[in-house]
């Protein structure tokens, strides 16, 4: 029996951190392919204006991923507006560049900074996963038995963390580590879980760096020797949604880069 490849057309997708960068590009691609998108981001983001640009197929749901109350309210809003949730793309995250110990400054990494990154990137991702799984579990299964797809965002820093990335690497490594067990948890419900680990991408943060720095970073990518385009992240998201046999995987999207110390 041939497997049914699912189109994104007609699906409802929640994209956390969806107000900018590759995450906004993801929402734009999904809407362009006939899906409906819910941009979930913090209240002071550009989510409202970006959602309006995408038209009636997109709404903004203000929420902090670390808040159970706010995420549940955002998911309820999505279901009230569009009837169900088929896809969740977890992209919200923060980063700090702090050494564990800086000898010259005699400065020790604070627990507060470490906990803040873990709380947003790792616990925030799990918070969305568990709550959206509860919503997807109420969906009627498609002909292949699927009720939903959850896509998380890790980083190559999960595998080759750099100086000053202890907190960030730990948070992204946690997302990598929980992908398979959560996929196994949700398999009986018909919910797939896949994680993307991006390399160096042209995010709003990187594009503010001096051109010389951007060119150096791009030169570290074996092929193609450039920064990743947000559209390439969005393309992979669509591929994951449409391929029903992708489950429990962490996919590096990095041009074969392996970060050196």
Swiss-Prot record:
Keywords: Acetylation, Fatty acid metabolism, Lipid metabolism, Mitochondrion, Mitochondrion nucleoid, NAD, Oxidoreductase, Steroid metabolism, tRNA processing. NAD(+) binds at residues 20, 41, 65, 91, 168, 172, 201, 203. GO terms for cellular component: endoplasmic reticulum; mitochondrial inner membrane; mitochondrial nucleoid; mitochondrial ribonuclease P complex; mitochondrion. Disruption phenotype: Conditional knockout mice are fertile but rapidly die around week 26. Mitochondrial morphology is severely altered in the central and peripheral nervous system, as well as in the cerebellum. Substrate binds at residue 155. The keyword Transcription regulation does not apply. SUPFAM superfamilies: NAD(P)-binding Rossmann-fold domains. InterPro entries: NAD(P)-bd_dom_sf (IPR036291), Sc_DH/Rdtase_CS (IPR020904), SDR_fam (IPR002347). GO terms for molecular function: 17-beta-hydroxysteroid dehydrogenase (NAD+) activity; 3-hydroxy-2-methylbutyryl-CoA dehydrogenase activity; 3-hydroxyacyl-CoA dehydrogenase activity; androstan-3-alpha,17-beta-diol dehydrogenase (NAD+) activity; chenodeoxycholate 7-alpha-dehydrogenase (NAD+) activity; cholate 7-alpha-dehydrogenase (NAD+) activity; estradiol 17-beta-dehydrogenase [NAD(P)+] activity; isoursodeoxycholate 7-beta-dehydrogenase (NAD+) activity. Homotetramer. Component of mitochondrial ribonuclease P, a complex composed of TRMT10C/MRPP1, HSD17B10/MRPP2 and PRORP/MRPP3. Interacts with TRMT10C/MRPP1; forming the MRPP1-MRPP2 subcomplex of the mitochondrial ribonuclease P complex. Belongs to the short-chain dehydrogenases/reductases (SDR) family. This is 3-hydroxyacyl-CoA dehydrogenase type-2. It comes from Mus musculus.
């Amino acid at each position: 029996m041939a497997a049914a490849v699912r189109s994104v057309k007609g699906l409802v997708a929640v994209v956390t951190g969806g107000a900018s960068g590759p995450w906004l590009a993801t929402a734009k691609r999904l809407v362009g392919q006939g899906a409906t998108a819910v941009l979930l981001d913090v209240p002071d983001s550009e989510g409202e204006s970006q959602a309006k640009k995408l038209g009636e197929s997109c709404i903004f749901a203000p929420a902090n991923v670390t808040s159970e109350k706010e995420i549940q309210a955002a998911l309820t809003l999505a279901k009230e507006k569009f009837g169900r949730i088929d896809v969740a793309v977890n992209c919200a995250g923060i980063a700090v560049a702090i050494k564990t110990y800086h000898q010259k400054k005699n400065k020790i990494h604070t627990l507060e900074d470490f906990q803040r990154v873990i709380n947003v990137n790792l616990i925030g991702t799990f918070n969305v996963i568990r709550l959206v799984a509860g919503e997807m579990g109420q969906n009627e299964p498609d002909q292949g038995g699927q009720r939903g797809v959850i896509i998380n965002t890790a980083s190559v820093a999960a595998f080759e963390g750099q100086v000053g990335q202890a907190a960030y690497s730990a948070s992204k490594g946690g997302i990598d580590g929980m992908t398979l067990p959560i996929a196994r948890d949700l398999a009986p419900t018909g919910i797939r879980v896949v994680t993307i680990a991006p390399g160096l991408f042209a995010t709003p943060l990187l594009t503010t760096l001096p051109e010389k720095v951007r060119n150096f970073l791009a030169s570290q990518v074996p092929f193609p020797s450039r920064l990743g385009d947000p559209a390439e992240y969005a393309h992979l998201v669509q591929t994951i949604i449409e391929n029903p046999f992708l489950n429990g995987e962490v996919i590096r999207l990095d041009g074969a880069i392996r970060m050196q110390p």
